[in-house]
Amino acid sequence: MTSRRPTKVEQFAIEAKLNLILGAEVYDRVFQGFEVLEVVNGELRGWCPSEHRAAVIDVQFSAIVAWIAQTMLNQPVRRVNVLMRGMRHDEREQPA
C-alpha cells in the first residue's frame, strides 16, 4: 500500500493552481479550506469545511483536482474522495 502526504509547499501549490485555473470566485466559494490529506494507491483523500463543499468537489471538480494533484505530486491520481473535515475515510489508513 503506497501512501503519500503532501508537504505544506505542495499543498499551497495545489491551492494556487486551483485558484489560477478555476478563478478566484469559484475557488473562494468551493475550495476555501480544502486540504489534501494523502494519496493512497491512486486515491486522493481530502477534507473540506462543509459536507456541501465536499460533495460539490466530488461531483463537479474531481477531474481537475486529480489532474492538478498528480502534476504537483508526480504520482498518479485515479480517484478523488473528499469528506467533511473530521470525518474518517478508512480507519485503517487514517492519518494520525
Short names for language-model regions:
Residues 1-96:
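Intrinsically disordered, low-complexity basic tails and flexible linkers associated
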